[in-house]
UniProtKB/Swiss-Prot annotation:
Species the sequence originates in: Dictyoglomus thermophilum (strain ATCC 35947 / DSM 3960 / H-6-12)
Entry EC no(s): 2.1.2.9
Cited function: Attaches a formyl group to the free amino group of methionyl-tRNA(fMet). The formyl group appears to play a dual role in the initiator identity of N-formylmethionyl-tRNA by promoting its recognition by IF2 and preventing the misappropriation of this tRNA by the elongation apparatus.
Official protein name in the record: Methionyl-tRNA formyltransferase
Residues engaged in binding (6S)-5,6,7,8-tetrahydrofolate: S109, I110, L111, P112
Catalytic reaction list: L-methionyl-tRNA(fMet) + (6R)-10-formyltetrahydrofolate = N-formyl-L-methionyl-tRNA(fMet) + (6S)-5,6,7,8-tetrahydrofolate + H(+)
Amino acid sequence: MRVIYFGTPEFSRIILEKIYDHLNIIGIVTQPDKPKGRGKKILPSPVKQFAINKGITVYQPEKLKGNIEFFNIIKDLKPDALIVASYGKIIPEDILNIPPYGGINVHASILPKYRGAAPIERALMNCEKETGVSIMKMEKGLDTGPVYAIKKIPILPDDDKGTLSIKLANLGADLLLEVLPLIKEGKLIPVPQDESLASYAPKLTKEEEIINWNMDGEKICCQIRALSPEPGAMTFFRGKILKVFKANFEKRFFDEDVINGTIIEQDRKKGIGVKVENGILWLLELQPEGKKKMNFLEFMNGYRLNIGERFE
């Protein structure tokens, strides 16, 4: 099968690497290079880096809609299918209609739940216990096309955006390789999504990165997991930004009236204990403004915390 692959982040690179030896990948389309990290260096996407290493031609159009030059490039390559995984732009219908098998998308959710750009983050943020991948026939709507296959996995208590992305990328690649021969042979007919069950997963906003210490402790934990390993959940301590990347929640009831966000315990095994709505949030991995990530012991030793101090 002659395939043009559309993808950008690490999630997409893992899928590409896994399917590479099984398909004839004749071109790769990825987002234009963007500034990344503290130094804001212009860096290629993980998918582009893989393509360069393998000597595959890379295309990085700024826009797709109305781009006649790009349309003709895809047409001239005569692909059998476009495979898309976290590309980051909506692919116009005229491009999807070029190959006989159209566009086939690997989406990191159990469709029709969590359509959109951030299904992994949203599933974690909402404390879901299960997620999965869907292989979908693409159409002009955002993740609205009929579904070829779905595979589900549990979300474990210690899963974060990083670990779950890797699991779902591997799951998606395996499922894709399973269904592609069936699609080619006409043995697999995609099933339309139930619109009444649809939900959306827009990118997380900057406001959603800020910890509200008055929230349910389990919800704060889910927020931290959804934002780890980057960009991190944000709070303020001693007037500066502090990011939290790992925490555990312990349900506990308090007699005394302690303000949420207050440090109430320091335990060299459990972490930094912060009072939240219905218990204690044990902070385990943190990053003070302008410094590297550190574990709670390094933070405790470096900052000499006082019981009664508050995160705001």
